[in-house]
Design a protein with these regions (language model features):
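Generic short beta-strand segments
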Residues: 88-94
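Short, low-complexity N-terminal intrinsically disordered segments enriched in polar/charged residues
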Residues: 1-36
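Hydrophobic beta-strand positions
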Residues: 77, 93, 109-110
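A solvent-exposed, acidic/Ser-Thr-rich amphipathic alpha-helical stretch
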Residues: 27-83
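Short beta-strand edge/turn micro-motifs at domain boundaries
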Residues: 101-114
């Protein structure tokens, strides 16, 4: 495999672990998929995320109150280098009965820091 394909495989694995930990509501494992500080731009808000930013309570209120699980609908690599991969994604949030809460487009920049 090439450096580029290795980086893509590692980035996709990171996103798999990210989603699995999120769906398990395992905040500690979820945060292990991040490099800190992490930057999130969503809903016209810029957040600088540091370790401990995510709390178990986040699954009980707000946008996640009705949420049961999420799934990737699309993950397309739009740029890849040896230590950074940009992935155009779409994920869908579901309720326990399988009905859709919403689908969201996002670009993830996955970096290899350590």
């Amino acid at each position: 495999m090439s450096e580029r394909s290795d980086a893509i495989a590692a980035a996709q694995k990171c996103l798999d672990e990210f989603m699995a930990a999120f769906n398990a509501r395992d905040v500690r494992s979820f945060e292990r998929t991040f490099n800190f500080p992490s930057v999130r731009l969503a809903s016209n808000t810029l957040a600088i995320i540091e370790p401990g930013y995510h709390k178990p309570e986040m699954f009980e209120t707000g946008a996640l109150a009705d949420w049961h699980h999420s799934a990737w609908e699309r993950r397309e690599v739009i740029h890849a280098g040896a230590d950074k991969v940009h992935i155009d994604t779409r994920f869908t949030r579901y309720r326990a009965d399988g009905s859709v809460i919403g689908s969201f487009d996002s670009i993830y920049v996955v970096t290899c820091e350590n």
